[in-house]
């Protein structure tokens, strides 16, 4: 049977593969023309070659790397079956990853929405909170006046490796006391929220996975400024004292960037909350 020859443009139309892709496949020895005119360098393909593009297109569609495509071209049916089984496993692994990532983004949005729906800033309110998973470490002499972004670097690095998603908030805990000055305050722990429910086993001895418990909290949120920090804490303390509420936890302080623009002055939202008996 006489073979029909097609130019690269004709193969592009017949197989629905771009000319650019066909040239690249030739370059990497994935799909080479049957004949190249030595005078014009035009590529020509035989009719029987077109079937090989079916496998290449199918493997490209499922995201198979080019080097793996080359290997697949040499496989017999039983071997190709095993190859597809492995591709299926890899796809399921990717789907599991994407599903977990979707849940993480959903949780981030849920927390952001809650923060955007707070009552008026600078006013104490009571809120029923869900449990929040955190990773924390002892503060070791850190307090409101000397805490730095760098103080959280170790926690953030661990969260990035465990969650794969950089957290946009961090916090601290301190005991509930009738403070009269910010100089009296020292943090017990610094922490950052954990965004996934994955089992985390490789923490260092100075770190601890724990939770901010589910329950009812007296809260105050405000845009940070040095002069407003202690005034807002005093509002929270006074609110609890005036209503004779029973405190059952430390104060949780959460700091959230309002924006990330390098062209603007840094701005932060501070949330202070303490669990109260229901």
From Swiss-Prot:
Q: Which Gene3D superfamilies does the record match to this protein? A: 1.10.1660.10, Regulatory factor, effector binding domain, Single helix bin
Q: What does this protein do?
A: Activates transcription of the bmr gene in response to structurally dissimilar drugs. Binds rhodamine as an inducer.
Q: What is this protein called?
A: Multidrug-efflux transporter 1 regulator
**Which residue ranges carry the DNA-binding annotation?**
8-27
Tell me yes or no: is Glycoprotein among this UniProt entry's keywords: no
What is a biological process (GO) this protein takes part in? Answer: regulation of DNA-templated transcription
- Record's subunit section: Binds DNA as a homodimer.
Q: Does the entry feature the keyword Metal-binding, yes or no?
A: no
């Amino acid at each position: 049977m006489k073979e029909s020859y097609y130019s690269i443009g004709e193969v592009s139309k017949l197989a629905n593969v771009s000319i650019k892709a066909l040239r690249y496949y030739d370059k990497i020895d994935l799909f080479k023309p049957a004949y190249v005119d030595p005078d014009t360098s035009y590529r020509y393909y035989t009719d029987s070659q077109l079937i090989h593009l079916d496998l290449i297109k199918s493997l490209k569609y499922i995201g198979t790397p080019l080097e793996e495509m080359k290997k697949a071209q040499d496989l017999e049916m039983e071997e190709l079956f095993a190859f597809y089984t492995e591709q299926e496993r890899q796809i399921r692994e990717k789907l599991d990853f994407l599903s977990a990532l979707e849940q993480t983004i959903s949780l981030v949005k849920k927390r952001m929405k809650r923060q955007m729906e707070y009552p008026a800033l600078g006013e104490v309110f009571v809120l029923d909170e869900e449990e929040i998973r955190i990773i924390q470490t002892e503060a070791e002499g850190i307090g409101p006046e000397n805490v730095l972004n760098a103080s959280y670097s170790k926690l953030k690095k661990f969260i990035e490796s465990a969650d794969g998603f950089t957290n946009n908030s961090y916090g601290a805990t301190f005991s509930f006391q009738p403070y009269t000055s910010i100089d009296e305050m020292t943090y017990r722990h610094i922490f950052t929220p954990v965004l996934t429910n994955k089992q985390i086993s490789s923490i260092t001895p100075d770190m601890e996975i724990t939770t901010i418990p589910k329950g009812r909290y007296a809260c105050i949120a405000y845009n940070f400024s040095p002069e407003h920090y202690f005034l807002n804490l005093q509002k929270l303390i006074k609110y609890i004292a005036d209503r004779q509420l029973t405190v059952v936890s430390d104060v949780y302080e959460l700091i959230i960037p309002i924006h990330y623009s390098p062209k603007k002055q840094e701005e932060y939202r501070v949330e202070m909350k303490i669990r109260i008996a229901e």
